[in-house]
Amino acid sequence: MAMDLLRHRLGRIDYLPAYEAMQVFTAARTPETPDELWICEHPPVYTQGLAGKAEHVFNPGTIPVVQTNRGGQVTYHGPGQVVAYPLLDLKRAGYFIKEYVYRIEEAVIRTLVEFGVTGHRVAGAPGIYVRLDDPGSHALLPQRPMKSGLANPSFGGLGKIAALGLKVSRNCTYHGVALNVAMDLEPYTRINPCGYAGLQTVDLSTIGVCAGWDEVAELLGDKLTRYLAP
């Protein structure tokens, strides 16, 4: 089923105005408001989720730190990263937050497939990961999702390539997903990404994929439109 999802390419915009615009849009929407998908990239910024702890940001330097109302802990946004914000009415879509997370992750996985990369889920740690030794490997991870209930997720041999942070208000979503394309990854060394010490962050460039921001943004937008459809 095709989804009536209005897609907007916002280019490079500061994080705070985008965050404020999402809040305004969500607060003002009615049951008839069309769903939207905002795609952009941000200048360097750290964002803290509701579970964020100050000790996970140990050397921000000149990069601003913005407290947000999304789930999760600290992450980094910067040039060379595709950020997608689906603004959906989940009640109208007909599924709940757990399935929504799964669908976003599936859209990222399907985007990576287009570049010969296999994305993996890790139980208890939303986001998408790749094997550092063989990014195209389809072999099942020992951290596979079927092994649920792990108190301390294992990231051995993995690099995180996409991060999720979401908020649902009155059954309507905002915030979203960030997929790393070709970034300066050094700012990740100044934080514990998503609250995990030692978690390695990668981008497509790091694992040998040469892809432009526009190409990845278009593909991710297409996949999100498809996999978020009712």
Curated annotation (Swiss-Prot):
Catalyzed chemical reaction(s): octanoyl-[ACP] + L-lysyl-[protein] = N(6)-octanoyl-L-lysyl-[protein] + holo-[ACP] + H(+)
Primary place of residence?
Answer: cytoplasm
The similarity comment for this entry is: Belongs to the LipB family.
Organism of provenance: Albidiferax ferrireducens (strain ATCC BAA-621 / DSM 15236 / T118)
A Gene Ontology molecular-function term? lipoyl(octanoyl) transferase activity
Which terms in the GO cellular component ontology are assigned? cytoplasm
The protein's annotated pathway: Protein modification; protein lipoylation via endogenous pathway; protein N(6)-(lipoyl)lysine from octanoyl-[acyl-carrier-protein]: step 1/2
Q: Where in the cell is it found?
A: Cytoplasm
Hey, where's the site called Lowers pKa of active site Cys on this chain? K160
- List, alphabetically, the PROSITE patterns matched: BPL_LPL_CATALYTIC, LIPB
Which keywords are on file for this protein? Acyltransferase, Cytoplasm, Transferase
InterPro entries in the record, alphabetically?
aa-tRNA-synth_II/BPL/LPL, BPL_LPL_catalytic, Octanoyltransferase, Octanoyltransferase_CS
Q: Misc remark for this entry?
A: In the reaction, the free carboxyl group of octanoic acid is attached via an amide linkage to the epsilon-amino group of a specific lysine residue of lipoyl domains of lipoate-dependent enzymes.
The identity of this protein, by name, is Octanoyltransferase
Superkingdom, natural source:
Bacteria
Q: Would the keyword Metal-binding turn up in this protein's UniProt record?
A: no
Give the enzyme's EC designation: 2.3.1.181
Q: Where is the active site?
A: C194
Output one GO BP term: protein modification process
Q: Record-annotated residues binding substrate?
A: R70, G71, G72, Q73, V74, T75, Y76, H77, A163, L164, G165, G176, V177, A178
